[in-house]
Amino acid sequence: MKKTKVINSDISRVIAQMGHFDKLSIGDAGMPVPRTTEKIDLAVTNGVPSFMEVLNNVLEELAVQRIYLAEEIKTENPDMLAAIETRLPETPISFIPHTEMKQELNNCHAFIRTGEMTPYANILLESNVVF
C-alpha cells in the first residue's frame, strides 16, 4: 500500500504524469467539466470532501508555481480566497474571469470534483519542477 499522503490512485497517477507548466484543477460540485477532460469525482455529499481538504492533500505531492482563480471569488467567496492565500502564501495568483476558467479546463490533465458547495471554489494549479 502506498505510504504517501495521496492514496487516491487516479489523483496519484495524474500528478505523476504532470510536467512543468501542466495544469490540474480542483473544484466545487457544480463546475461543468468538458467531456475531453478527465474528471476524478470525489464528491460524496454536500461539503464532503471539502475543497480545502482536497487541495491540502494534492499540495502534499504536487509542486505548484502559479495558481489561477476566478476573479469573482474576491466578492462572492472571500473566505475561500483567504483560505487559499493562507495555504499558498508564496505562490503567485492570476485572477481570470470564471468563463475563462471553465474554458481552461480543456487544457488540464484532470479536474478533481469535490463536495464543496460554495461559489467559485475552483482552482487551476500550474505545476513546477522540483529541482
Curated annotation (Swiss-Prot):
Active site: 20
Catalysed reactions, semicolon-separated: beta-D-ribopyranose = beta-D-ribofuranose
Major subcellular location class: cytoplasm
Keyword set, alphabetical order: Carbohydrate metabolism, Cytoplasm, Isomerase
Domain of life: Bacteria
GO biological process, one term: D-ribose catabolic process
One cellular component term from this protein's GO annotations in UniProt: cytosol
Description of how the protein assembles with itself and partners: Homodecamer.
Name this protein carries in UniProt: D-ribose pyranase
